[in-house]
Amino acid sequence: MAGASLKSVQRWLTATMIAVGMQLSTPLVAQAEPATPGWREVWTGVDASRHVWLLYGGVTVAPHGDIFSEGVRLRVAGGYGGYTYEGERRGQMQAFNARTAYAEALVGYYKQFGPLFAKGFVGVAAIEHDVDPIDPENPVQGQEVGPKLVAEFWLNMGSSAWSQVDLSWTSAHQTAAARVRAGYRIWGDLSIGPEGGINSNDLGEDARAGLFARYAWAGGEFSLAGGFAGRFLEDAQSLQDPYANANWLMQF
């Protein structure tokens, strides 16, 4: 049943992304002309560490204006990945391999308050964890669907410095995430700075701290990040697991 549920999440995610891609596609000829800012934002990325990997992507649209103006936002997103962990079961160490997939649909609003830019979303999320072999002591298994809340903030601190905070929570496996970045533009729109984050669910919390580089241009951005993470499961390990992240975003 768990495998069937995971496949259903994957099929839903694939169908949604294909449908959105077909709807948002535009002729290449239109890109040759200088145009007003677009109303679509598409992103994709990969996140990996020694025990965890995740491929993710999503689309945000502004149905009543361009992507930089205040107003309603619609978003669909999802991802697929895997992870491993160990635990003592029946007096001996047991290794577990897991696959995970998620999909979400959200509606929200984008508002500017001077140098502060804020987005808030509400919606529904489906998250699946398929653990092999079945772990009787792991509460995060199977598929759960529940409401989701998202808050995103960007603050310009002068002409060169900025900070970013992203927060999310869903009742599906009590999954939550928080990420903080502080950037400084060292040349044009090339920024570098520190980042930190926490990811949690019913199984426990993972924390990370590292550095990132972000390059932005008219209509897009690309960022790379790396550092160390800690998997706070049974023995609350310190931050000693290297991680890397790459993210690409386009607005059109």
Question: What is each stretch, according to the model?
Answer:
Residues 2, 28-71, 130-132, 141-147:
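Outer-membrane beta-barrel initiation region
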Residues 52, 211-217, 238-252:
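Outer-membrane beta-barrel "beta-signal"
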Residues 29-39, 62-73, 112-118, 156-162, ...:
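Short loop/turn motifs that connect adjacent beta-strands in outer-membrane beta-barrel proteins
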Residues 72-175, 196, 226-230, 237-245, ...:
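Outer-membrane pore/translocation modules
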Residues 210-211, 221-229:
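C-terminal transmembrane helix-loop-helix hairpin of multi-pass membrane proteins
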Residues 176-179, 184-210:
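Intrinsically disordered, low-complexity segments enriched in Gly and acidic/Ser/Thr residues
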Residues 1-39, 252:
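Cleavable N-terminal export/targeting peptides
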Residues 43, 58-62, 106-108, 150-154, ...:
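Outer-membrane beta-barrel architecture
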